[in-house]
């Protein structure tokens, strides 16, 4: 069905557009946390003056640390320009070690990011990567941040190159990195290549969730063993029970990841995969658009018999809202040979104002009632459709409904109205219906004229001729009856006259 297919495609595109705007803003907060962690590490190193200090090249001097901290405080107070002034002054110093340059550039990049000056933020991070002695972890973080920023700036090819470099540096990348890779591939319309990174992200995420839950369970078990006193034991028992329950539950993948994978498979026309993904989404994220997408997948796979179940489920959960959605549901009921259900749905929603009061919808309602053998209930819908329409077809249908209900006078009025409007698909059939109604109203001459008009087409010539013969026979029979009745009356009158004459003679 057209609406189902259109809704199917629109839902997939909307889902991808939604996922494209969300992860980057969240992920880039890592830039700030990296800068803070480096500053904290420098402070810790300064406190280890008992011989456990790191190499000089990996230390931050007191003055540099204090200025970075000051810049951080100023930025958090909302003075980005003040923070930049301090950091740029530091950067200009020729006395900075490579490690100190690394920390200054890292925080400088974050300030620019906070100001939404992404090009300058990227330049700062790119300069960081040029430092020969940059720490491995910092190189990983910076490369990934640059990939995110290039994605935001729509430099998708460069972003892909950076992510690939990040994968070379990071042996165990987070699932979100694979999703970022897939998002950039999407922007370049490399849809087939999207599938492996998304599925890798899902597999890794499931593994991480299971491991984290198992660790939480084991930790809770240890805490219970260490617990003392009734309250402490009770609290530890509850915690272990919750941790055990979570460990036994199947982890749930993020909704937007499924949406992205769904779109990738859709572009490959792998509708069986699309169908399976919709079913998973409906288990964890039961939303209207996924029922429609499932219905669309069934349509593409030729599994039309299952289409109604998807739509009916959405209807049962009160997810249908638009007129076209209710009409589609009614059409599916009719295809499934449950026309009465279609009729009651349309009737109710037209009265509620959620289905448009159009000729098309009233016609569908009348068809549903007619197929359900509820001709009388079809009349109001047919009347409404005939009133709206400037074509005679609906008047003819109304006339035929009256004919079926033996309401012949109304039938004549409606069919004549339809013939007057014109634009009837089969005028000969209209004349036959008119002739039948006129015949039952005993308007024989007008009925003959209607059947003569119908007989002008080869299709209706025979049946019209048969009706004319029937009417002429009825007219002749009625004439014979009238003659017989007249003769009988004459005989009765003559008999009465003779009796009257005989009675008078006796007097």
Give the ranges of each region predicted by the language model.
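N-terminal leader/linker segments that initiate helical-solenoid repeat arrays
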Residues: 8, 21, 25-126, 133-141, ...
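Solenoid-like repeat scaffolds
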Residues: 53-59, 91-97, 129-135, 164-172, ...
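Generic helix N-cap/helix-start motif at coil->alpha-helix transitions
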Residues: 60-68, 98-105, 135-145, 170-180, ...
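Alpha-helical adaptor scaffolds
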Residues: 359-373, 380-429
């Amino acid at each position: 069905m057209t609406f189902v297919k259109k809704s199917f495609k629109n839902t997939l595109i909307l889902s991808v557009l939604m996922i494209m705007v969300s992860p980057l803003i969240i992920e880039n907060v890592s830039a700030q946390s990296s800068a803070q962690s480096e500053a904290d590490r420098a402070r810790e190193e300064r406190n280890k003056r008992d011989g456990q200090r790191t190499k000089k090249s990996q230390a931050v001097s007191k003055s540099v640390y204090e200025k970075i901290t000051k810049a951080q405080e100023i930025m958090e107070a909302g003075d980005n320009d003040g923070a930049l002034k301090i950091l740029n002054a530091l950067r200009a110093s020729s006395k900075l070690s490579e490690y100190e340059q690394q920390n200054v550039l890292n925080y400088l990049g974050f300030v620019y990011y906070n100001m939404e000056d992404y090009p300058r933020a990227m330049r700062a991070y790119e300069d960081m990567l040029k430092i020969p002695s940059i720490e491995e972890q910092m190189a990983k973080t910076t490369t990934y941040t640059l990939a995110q920023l290039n994605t935001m700036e729509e430099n998708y090819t460069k972003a892909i190159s950076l992510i690939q470099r990040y994968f070379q540096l990071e042996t165990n990348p987070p699932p979100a990195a694979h999703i970022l890779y897939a998002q950039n591939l999407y922007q370049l319309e490399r849809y087939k290549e999207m599938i492996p990174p998304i599925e890798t992200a899902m597999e890794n995420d499931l593994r991480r969730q299971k491991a984290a839950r198992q660790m939480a369970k084991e930790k809770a078990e240890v805490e219970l063993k260490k617990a003392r006193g009734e309250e402490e034991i009770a609290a530890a028992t509850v915690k272990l029970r919750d941790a055990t329950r979570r460990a036994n539950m199947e982890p749930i993948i993020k909704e937007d990841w499924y949406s992205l994978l769904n779109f990738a498979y859709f572009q490959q026309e792998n509708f069986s995969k699309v169908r399976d993904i919709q079913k998973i989404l409906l288990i964890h994220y039961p939303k209207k658009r996924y029922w429609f997408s499932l219905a669309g997948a069934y349509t593409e796979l030729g599994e039309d018999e299952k289409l109604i179940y998807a739509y009916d489920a959405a209807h049962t959960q009160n997810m249908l809202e638009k007129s076209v959605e209710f009409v589609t549901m009614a059409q599916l009921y009719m295809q499934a040979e449950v026309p009465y259900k279609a009729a009651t749905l349309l009737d109710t929603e037209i009265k509620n104002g959620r289905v448009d009061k159009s000729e098309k919808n009233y016609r569908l309602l009348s068809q549903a009632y007619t197929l359900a053998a509820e001709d009388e209930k079809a009349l109001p819908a047919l009347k409404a459709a005939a009133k709206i329409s400037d074509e005679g077809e609906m008047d003819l249908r109304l006339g035929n409904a009256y004919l079926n209900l033996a309401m012949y006078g109304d039938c004549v009025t409606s069919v004549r109205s339809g013939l007057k409007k014109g634009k009837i698909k089969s005028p000969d059939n209209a004349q036959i219906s008119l002739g039948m109604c006129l015949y039952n109203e005993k308007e024989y001459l007008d009925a003959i004229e209607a059947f003569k008009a119908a007989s002008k087409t080869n299709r209706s010539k025979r049946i019209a001729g048969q009706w004319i013969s029937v009417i002429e026979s009825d007219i002749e029979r009625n004439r014979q009856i009238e003659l017989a009745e007249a003769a009988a009356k004459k005989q009765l009158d003559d008999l009465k006259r003779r009796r009257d004459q005989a009675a008078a003679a006796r007097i």
